[in-house]
């Protein structure tokens, strides 16, 4: 075949010469390149101001040496063959590559129809290039082809264009609009990044993905028109598009990647988002830091995953509408959404990430998914919720999960809860009540420190309590600690200034350093199981007048019972004690800076030759070798009150009046002003202290005791145990007020009002907490249900019938 072509060409040339026509061997590359293999084309060279390379019979212009401002790209370049260097072969130009790189002269270029590819760095840094005219056969615009053409104001993307590569038009800071054709199927990374004048983008329907960084930092972009067919928007695709106010996403979109619309480095204008119905996943930081995104954010029905910090810092969003199919809300997803008012998680949510709603400080209502098994670290840190109901599916509360929720006043814990982690409710300064479920095993460090709990009863399943777990709760009056807890840790109840009663059950072995320091215990009974009391365990305790140590105690740390007041008159130390630390017993100091002194009437009891005797001798403390001093029981039949005094042979009389009546607190009923008088051999006698036991009716929930001191009254709250309250005092007069059960008073304010009805109704909807759950069984059928709600409605509104 090649031989025939040669013969044809030679014959044609001969005819032309006979006719007097000058002919150059022009190559028509519509023919196969192999037809010209004998010519051995020279594949690189120059033609005028252009350098070129040839491959497969097509020319690529690789350089331009001219200085013209207006340039027209030639349709073809001439080359020769190695065997016939005098012959010129015309080769069509189909591509440009690095042709005008860093050319500051060119302002306008015309590209012929035959060019299908504008390749790598073709016009990069042509900072005066304003207009580009190209043919309809253009299929590909290569990497950085027009990058940093800062004067380029427009570009016509015509049908037939298939590919725009990475950085193709990045840093084109004068480009104002982009309309992509339907033929375009590939849009490269950073294709239009940093085009600061770009105002509008319209996608054709051939694009399935918007690539990473494609329009990042297009700071003037106000309009994006997405076509149906786009399925994914890659990371940072529209990040820092600070002028964008409204966003409407197509129904075809299923995935939005990391930081796709994130306001990373700039102020934001985005105010609303309309999500398409097909969206399934929102990636990390996808819409983070849009501070003007406001109002209701409605998430689409197909959405299953919200990524890390996806809407973090969207501080103007007030309401979230989650779809029922949502499964995962990841770390920090709505962190710092400070105007958010409520959170209602559908039961399909099984995973909640750390800090998911951290610092949403205006959230008042929280409804958790019934499928969650763990509430992670910092999930609701600093939120404004007032009451909390944790579903029974939850077994673990993480570190600082509800820390600094300053309005949280009541919590209903999961009945299957096993672990409350470090600082879980730290500094919830309004938290007044909580009921710990049976089955709870661990309470972490500072878990309830600086709350306002009034009473705690720890379940007998608890085996681990963290340091400072109940640190600095001045409102705490009573604590019950089970024997399942072998160690009461360091500072567990430190600075609980109001703690006047503690029940320590058999099984506890160690009380660590400062565990009850600065409490206000009146009496202390330690179980026989305790073998060690740490340094300063009860240091600074005020008003403590009686202590009963366990029979197996071995170690008493230094300053263990260095008290704040001179109220302890005696103490029996069992023979089992083998070590007593410095100033551990018998000393008191009103303030920390005062030098401790031995109590003015203190006597230490113990066995001869015991550690107690050695301690007494070395500290110049009075010591008596005898068994533990007993208390004498005195009973008043008229009142039913039993009093124990450290003296025998006394006569007791108790009088009740209302002469010094103080106004009871709301919800309390005045019972009387009680005066206890003792005589001995006909003369008035005042024992060093009294242990008072007052019987209580079954429906009494708690009592307030007002005791008169020289500097005024002080108040203690007691909860009946086994049908009575018990307290120790050095005074002989007190006022007693009682708070009885009031059916319907579920908010525990002493009255039954509409507020109780609202609280009970929220509780029934599994979205609330009862402050006094024992008052919820209005029809006395031993269950709290809809009948009780109806009963309360009829009580408040008889017309309901």
Predicted segments, located by residue:
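Low-complexity, acidic Ser/Thr/Pro-rich repeat tracts that form intrinsically disordered stalk/linker regions
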Residues: 23-51, 56-58, 801
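Proteolytic processing hotspots in large secreted/extracellular or virion-associated proteins
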Residues: 662-704, 709
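Proteolytic cleavage junctions
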Residues: 628-640, 682, 709-742
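Cellulosome-associated attachment modules in secreted, modular CAZymes
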Residues: 23-27, 738-801
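Structural signature of tandem-repeat unit edges
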Residues: 8, 49-50, 54-57, 66-94, ...
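Short domain-boundary/entry signatures in modular proteins, especially
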Residues: 66, 383, 519, 625-631, ...
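Sec-dependent N-terminal signal peptides of Gram-positive bacterial secreted proteins and lipoproteins
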Residues: 4-27
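Consensus positions within tandem repeat domains that build extended binding/scaffold surfaces
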Residues: 99, 119-122, 142-145, 165-168, ...
